[in-house]
Amino acid sequence: MKTKILLVFAILSVIPILCAMQSMTGQPVKKTRSSTFIYEKEKLWEPAGDGVTRQIMGYDGQAMLVKVKFEKGAIGTPHTHYHTQVTYVVSGKFEFTVGNEKQIVAAGDGIYIEPDAMHGCVCLEAGVLIDSFAPMRADFLVKPKP
């Protein structure tokens, strides 16, 4: 009986360690990280939709920071993901929808988006957003095949 209790305790104590070593996609996260310093002038803007481009500005398995540039009229298509997202409006004006709530946000404003919440935006004045994600968006690191 004592051996079984010790075995169960040992297994239960290892589970958090194993969980911390993998993202939701099962990929290891401990060794996944960006460079320490990321310079805007050296990063390409990646397409992220019509009139939308992005630069990944830093990440590890636990967090990611992404700069997103919108042309006027561009749409951040409504979507969900399991990540917590916090967005800071650097410039421009956007109509954001999070769940059933719709608000106009502008430079200096922020948006908190809980995991699995439907959200999207329409760019009313060209601008830039800074998106932070926890855990990182591993899907942003997958490059489409030509």
Residues covered by each model-derived region:
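Ligand-binding loop in jelly-roll beta-barrel domains
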Residues: P115-D139
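Positively charged n-region of N-terminal signal peptides that target proteins for export
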Residues: M1-K4
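Conserved short histidine dyad/triad with adjacent acidic residue
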Residues: M64-T80
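A cytosolic small-molecule/anion-sensing beta-strand core signal
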Residues: V90-S91, A106-A107, E125
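Bacterial N-terminal signal peptides
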Residues: V8-I17
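Short acidic-glycine-tyrosine-enriched beta hairpin
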Residues: E101-P115
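A short, N-terminal "cap"/entry segment at the start of jelly-roll beta-barrel domains
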Residues: L18, Q22-Q62, P144-P146
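Glycine- and acidic-residue-biased ligand/ion/polar-headgroup-sensing regions
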Residues: Y82-F94, G99
